[in-house]
Every structure is written in structure tokens, then in C-alpha cells.
């Protein structure tokens, strides 16, 4: 199978969930991202990968409205992003849980932040906690949970109001390799039940191939789109998928696109 190479937009037939056009972000030290363009389809799980410092996290923050671009525009369902949008959930590398709140209280905090009545979302919070394999830990506090469990609480919190778009910035980066692998399968289960559109950032090629419908490989700083690789593996994916010949081929394609930059 030939992989689509692109420095432009991923074309779609319907309005994209996310559309980025000529996005550039410059700092005093230079451009982190330059003329970046791509699209994410509705209900698609798309992952950004690339060399360290290529602007993956900066891109996510511009799309979320947390950081303004120097040039270019980001759109969510056709609406230009000029401030944080309520229908977008965000998960960071650190779970950022409130230490004085229990698991369910941390999940319900999202409703409070958005001015909603937490009581109306209690059943959804319990359903998400169960889906994330945290049943029985509803009343536990963050210090009583492992790192992986804390991150699952953060994911449940981000999903509480059922955002149509979920942005995830290296959410498993601080976890050990075994916990990280388990979290990948847990996230796949949660996403399969909700089918939110997801834009995910990771340094792990294995994680990217396991989770994604599409992988966007970025160039070294300043970040641009180097390649777009569709992941045509059937779902659900499990531990056997990791040794599947097609999985290995896709992972090699991603790795080759990243490593090619080291010799260019």
C-alpha cells in the first residue's frame, strides 16, 4: 500500500471536524510551527507524531484556543477558533486532579467549571468511571490512585459533557511502559463507546498505530506536515495486533518518515 505524502490539507468530502490552514506560531527563538495545514474528519482518531520540539503540543494549544497563532487559522466545524470553545475537551500529560476531591467529584468538576448542575451529570460520571475500569474507586482521592488511574479520571472528566472534540496532549507520557500500553487499550475502549473526534499527540509510534485512524507525521522544527499515513487495521485492536504484520509495516512507515529527517 502506498502512503499518502502531504505538505498540504487532507481533503475530505464533508465539513471537517478540525481544519488547520497555514498555521504558524513564532517565538523569540524562532518558529515552532510554520504553514501547517491538515484536516480531521468527524469521529476520527488522528495522531500527531514527530521529532521532539516540532510543535505538536503548540499545535494542539492553538486548535484549542489556548494559544493564538502568529499566522494562519484553525477551524472547528467551520467556526474559526479565536478563544477556548466549550465543546472541546482537553487532556494534558499531567492529570491535574484536585487533591481534596474524590474520583467522582473530580469528574463532576467539569460540570461546575461550565456552569452546569453537577447533579444532572452524576449518572454519566458513574457510567464513565465504570467504562474506564474505575468502578469501586469513586470515593478515592488522587493520592490513593496510581498514575494510570489518575489519568483515566482526567479522561472521564474531559468526556463528562460529551465534547464533540477531544484534544489529548501526550496523556500517557509520564507512565511506565506497561501501564502506558494498558492505558492505550483502555482509551480505545472508552473512545469506541463514545466516538468523539480525537486529536492525539504522542512520541510513541506503537501508541500512534494502535490507537489511530490516521497518523500525521510532522517535520522537525518548524513543524509542517511531512506525511499522512492511514491506519487500516481492523478494530477493536488488542495485544495480538501489536505483532500483526500490517501493524509492523505501518509502524515502520511512521519511523522511516521521522528518521528520514535526521539525514536530510
What are the residue ranges of the model-derived segments?
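The feature captures the beta-strand-to-loop junction immediately N-terminal to the Walker
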Residues: 49-51
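Helix-to-loop junction immediately C-terminal to a conserved catalytic motif
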Residues: 64
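Conserved ABC transporter NBD signature motif
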Residues: 72-84, 124
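Short coil-to-helix segment of the ABC ATPase nucleotide-binding domain corresponding to the Q-loop/switch region
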Residues: 101-108
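Conserved ABC ATPase "signature" region
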Residues: 112, 119-137, 189
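Conserved signature/switch motifs of ABC ATPase nucleotide-binding domains
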Residues: 140-143, 161
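Catalytic Walker B motif of ABC-type/P-loop ATPase nucleotide-binding domains
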Residues: 166-169
